[in-house]
């Protein structure tokens, strides 16, 4: 690789909106603010919910549920 053309790689502080703070490396060279992190994201915390908006699943099963049981 060529020397002198790559940006500096430094340790920075990343702060989440939930208050979690950790250090990471970046070429940005300034502290960053995150909206979500692994401490508050629903996928990592296990608090993920699947919402049925407007009863669409029930409406689908009512209309087409009988078609699969005829076999």
Curated annotation (Swiss-Prot):
InterPro entries, alphabetized: Ribosomal_bL28/bL31-like_sf, Ribosomal_bL31, Ribosomal_bL31_A, Ribosomal_bL31_sf
Any one GO biological process: translation
Necessary cofactors: Zn(2+)
Transmembrane annotation, as ranges: none
Keywords: Metal-binding, Ribonucleoprotein, Ribosomal protein, RNA-binding, rRNA-binding, Zinc
CC cofactor note: Binds 1 zinc ion per subunit.
Sites where the protein binds Zn(2+): 16, 18, 37, 40
GO molecular function terms listed in the Swiss-Prot or TrEMBL record: metal ion binding; rRNA binding; structural constituent of ribosome
GO cellular component: ribonucleoprotein complex; ribosome
Organism superkingdom: Bacteria
HAMAP family: Ribosomal_bL31_1
Record-linked PANTHER family: 50S RIBOSOMAL PROTEIN L31, CHLOROPLASTIC (PTHR33280), LARGE RIBOSOMAL SUBUNIT PROTEIN BL31A (PTHR33280:SF6)
Binding partners and assembly: Part of the 50S ribosomal subunit.
Entry similarity comment: Belongs to the bacterial ribosomal protein bL31 family. Type A subfamily.
Free-text function comment from the UniProt entry: Binds the 23S rRNA.
Protein known as: Large ribosomal subunit protein bL31
Natural source organism: Pseudoalteromonas translucida (strain TAC 125)
Organism ancestry: Bacteria, Pseudomonadati, Pseudomonadota, Gammaproteobacteria, Alteromonadales
């Amino acid at each position: 690789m060529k020397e002198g053309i790559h940006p500096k790689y430094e340790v920075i502080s990343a702060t989440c909106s939930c208050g979690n703070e950790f250090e990471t490396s970046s070429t940005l060279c300034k502290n960053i603010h995150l909206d979500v992190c692994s401490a508050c994201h629903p996928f990592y915390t296990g608090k993920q919910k699947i919402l049925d908006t407007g009863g669409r699943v029930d409406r689908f099963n009512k209309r087409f549920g009988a078609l699969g049981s005829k076999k």
